[in-house]
C-alpha cells in the first residue's frame, strides 16, 4: 500500500494521523508541492494532481482524505476505530469531519495563501472573511468540546484527524488560548504519540513553508 502525500498539505497530515493512530504500514511517496516539475510528474500519474492519494497493492487508487480514512478503518479495524460502528455516532463523526474541512481548513488555507502575497496585494476582504469563519469554528468547537475529551466524545476519531492540522496553522493567525475548551483539547491531543510523530516529521517542511 502506497501513500502519495506532502507534509505541507493539511489533508495529507490528516491521513497520516489516521495511519499512525492505527499503526498501519505503508510505503511513503513524498510529493514536493513547491516544485512545478514534480507536480507535473504527479499529474501524469494522477491527473487531478491532488494529495493525499492512497494506492492499494492491486493498483486501485483511493483519493480524498476522508475516503482514505474510511477505507483504512474498514480494512484495518484494529483500535482505534476512526468511525464508530453505531450509525448515529458515525454520522456525527462524518459531520464534524466535514465541518472541519469546510469551515476550518479551507479558510485557513485562504489566509495562508493570501499572507504569502506582498502586503499591498493582499485582499483584506478575503482575510477578514476567512478570519470570521475561523472564529466561528473556534467558538463552535469550544462549546462542542464541553464534557468531551475529543470532538466526537471520549474516543479519538476521524473528526480529530480533520481538526488537528488546520488548528495548528490557524493558531498562527488567530490565537485560541482564550477559548478554554479548545485550548484544553489542543493541549490534550498534542500529547498523543501519533500527533507527536506526525508533527516531528512535518515540522521542517512546515517551517520552510511558513518562512520560519
Predicted regions and their residues:
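GST-like domain detector, emphasizing the conserved glutathione-binding G-site
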Residues: 1-128, 142
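A local structural micro-motif
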Residues: 27, 80, 153, 197-198
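Short, solvent-exposed turn/loop segments enriched in Gly/Ser/Thr/Pro and often Arg
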Residues: 32, 158, 202-203
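Short beta-strand(s) of the beta-wing in winged-helix/HTH DNA-binding folds
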Residues: 52-55, 151, 196
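GST-like fold's C-terminal all-alpha helical module
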Residues: 100-193
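Terminal-tail/helix-coil boundary detector
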Residues: 200-212
